[in-house]
Amino acid sequence: MNSSDEEKQLQLITSLKEQAIGEYEDLRAENQKTKETCDKIRQERDEAVKKLEEFQKISHMVIEEVNFMQNHLEIEKTCRESAEALATKLNKENKTLKRISMLYMAKLGPDVITEEINIDDDDPGTDTDAAAETCVSVQCQKQIKELRDQIVSVQEEKKVLAIELESLKSKLGEVMEEVNKVKQEKAVLNSEVLEQRKVLEKCNRVSVLAVEEYEELQVNLELEKDLRKKAESFAQEMFIEQNKLKRQSHLLLQSSLPDQQLLKALDENAKLIQQLEEERIQHQQKVKELEERLENEALHKEIHNLRQQLELLEDDKRELEQKYQSSEEKARNLKHSVDELQKRVNQSENSVPPPPPPPPPLPPPPPNPIRSLMSMIRKRSHPSGGSTKKEKATQPETAEEVTDLKRQAVEEMMDRIKKGVHLRPVNQTARPKAKPDSLKGSESAVDELKGILGTLNKSTSSRSLKSLGPENSETELERILRRRKLTAEADSSSPTGILATSESKSMPVLGSVSSVTKSALNKKTLEAEFNNPCPLTPEPGEGPRKLEGCTNSKVTFQPPSKGGYRRKCVGSENQSEPVVVLDPVSTHEPQTKDQAAEKDPTQCKEEERGETQPEFKEDSSGGKTGETDSSNC
């Protein structure tokens, strides 16, 4: 099989080589023919150029002769004119001489005059005869005739030469046209020759490649022949060894009668050896076939991949051309629209001046960061909105009572501020400058606050936490609201009684409480504020509050000074920063947005100027803390 395939390949290669050689010979013959035609055209061109040069020489000779004749004619004309001028001068001189002679003869006698006159009569006749002889001499007439004949002949020659010149010029133009045609044909022939040379070079390359492939195939053939010979020799050696082994086995069998099992094993061994050799030969053939297939498949895959890449590139090119055309159209449309808009703008600027800009909107009210943080914590503890709806449904009545209590508490606070309660001074030097912070998520703010609370928990002693006991598990806000509710129910009949009881209950009594218990209570209130799932009952119809204005506010905590913790609410919009001090004995009271707006402006002014806030101490009997209003932060 291999030998037949190799012979077929060799036949194909030889046929291709013969075809390439035949094409090469045909192209060579065509090249020779084109060279012969080119040589003929060159010879014709050279002959035409020679004829042109001869015509040019003849025309130059004729022009020189004509110029010589014209010069000779001009010389003869000048000679004749000079002769005529001399004749006129002589006539004038003769006349003057006659006049002079007549004057002299008048002086002489009449006899002499008559004689003289006779002599003179004879003389003018002789003079006229001499003049006639001079004028009518044969030589002059001959010369004049010759000159006239020469002039006529020269003119005729001139006409003939002019005609010849015109004919030569026409011939020259025709020859030039022929030369141009020959040049064009030569250029065409040169281009054809170049093309044929390129084809010849391609054929040479193809023939070189074919020869190289033929040589490679010859080398492979020789190698395969050598390998086949080696394989045959190896097979012969193996066959000889196998025969030797068979003989030895027969001798052994004859010498010692073995068992039937040994005979069967030997037979099986021989069969297995034959099968192994056959399988080895088949395996080698399969390996060769697979290698050839792999080579062919690799080439086909490369060609297929290249074709696919070509198609993809062509598609990309078309898409890019379409995009380019569309972008050009868009650019034109945009230019047109820009021009129209510029025209409109120019017309509007020229026609009517622009109206004044509207006034800027009023700045929003300052946000309440503590309220926003509380709403954030509420959202974190209650992510779903179903629980808030249930709470709103279950507690619509208590919200109205709480709002009334809040209003009463605000009025009480305002009365105390107006009466002039002594306020604690606040250290304003430790106040940090307001810096614009970027908007952070609710989770990061809550994590920071919880970390601060953790540090506060670590700083305080464990005794203060144990001394509080299980009574502090309830939040301070719930206690205050419960107490206010009881007082409101007890004294609902008279508003003065409500005010008195609420004032007596909410008014702090100055007592001696240890600083440890104060700090512990303050910590517990802070933890209750930030960790309570629902510290404030929302107003009906309000829904969960959102965190607004976090970018313009910042909450900072200060370490305890003189037994209390201070918290600052710094706003980047306000230059004078309001300070809220959370003391261990201060009371926390809830407020709504409307109540915060109804506050007295004097309190806001005092807080902006940096004055201290009222300090409310815990009652010794109850041990409860209040809440300061922090809506102005």
Swiss-Prot record:
TM annotation in the entry: none
Residues covered by region (Disordered): 343-508, 525-633
Entry PTM: Phosphorylated on Ser-101 and Ser-249 by PAK1 through a CDC42- and RAC1-dependent signaling pathway, which enhances its association with F-actin retrograde flow in filopodia and lamellipodia of axonal growth cones. Phosphorylation on Ser-101 and Ser-249 is increased by netrin-1.
Modification sites for Phosphoserine: S3, S4, S101, S249, S375, S473, S494, S506, S515
Species of origin: Rattus norvegicus
Described function: Involved in the generation of internal asymmetric signals required for neuronal polarization and neurite outgrowth. Mediates netrin-1-induced F-actin-substrate coupling or 'clutch engagement' within the axon growth cone through activation of CDC42, RAC1 and PAK1-dependent signaling pathway, thereby converting the F-actin retrograde flow into traction forces, concomitantly with filopodium extension and axon outgrowth. Plays a role in cytoskeletal organization by regulating the subcellular localization of phosphoinositide 3-kinase (PI3K) activity at the axonal growth cone.
Record's compositionally biased regions (Pro residues): 352-369
Keyword Coiled coil: yes
Name of this protein: Shootin-1
Family statement: Belongs to the shootin family.
Positions bearing N-acetylmethionine: M1
Positions in coiled-coil regions: 7-353
Free-text tissue specificity from the UniProt record: Brain-specific (at protein level). Expressed in hippocampal neurons.
Keyword Coiled coil found: yes
Alphabetical UniProt keywords: Acetylation, Cell projection, Coiled coil, Cytoplasm, Cytoskeleton, Developmental protein, Phosphoprotein
GO CC entries: axon; axonal growth cone; cell leading edge; cytoplasm; cytosol; filopodium; growth cone; lamellipodium
